[in-house]
């Protein structure tokens, strides 16, 4: 990228990054969530096709597209519906770094990795899946687009 303008934080910035559009154009003009004190506005990444993601464009161009990490673009869509062929991560907002039950593997027919009790740490696991996706693209002999979105920068541990 030679130019990217970030006019919002968090969810709207993710929508901006994935589409190249301003957050209000993506349907996500404010932080996604259900907090009653938050102003009403644009809630949720539009799942219709008028805002194409970079993953959709690159998938159509023959890339292997994968995402590992935090989605948090509303519940109207998910990474698979928006051009990613493989996904592992947190679909919603902040949650535990140590509880594998709150993380999702998509498409749904994929078997998630198993971690012994006490060994799961989200940043490491998100990285493990990213490496798996790199290996998968290599095996399929396809160029790779990997969107890696760690949750760790959001809160102190």
Placement of each model-derived feature along the sequence:
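Formylglycine-dependent sulfatase
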Residues: 1-157
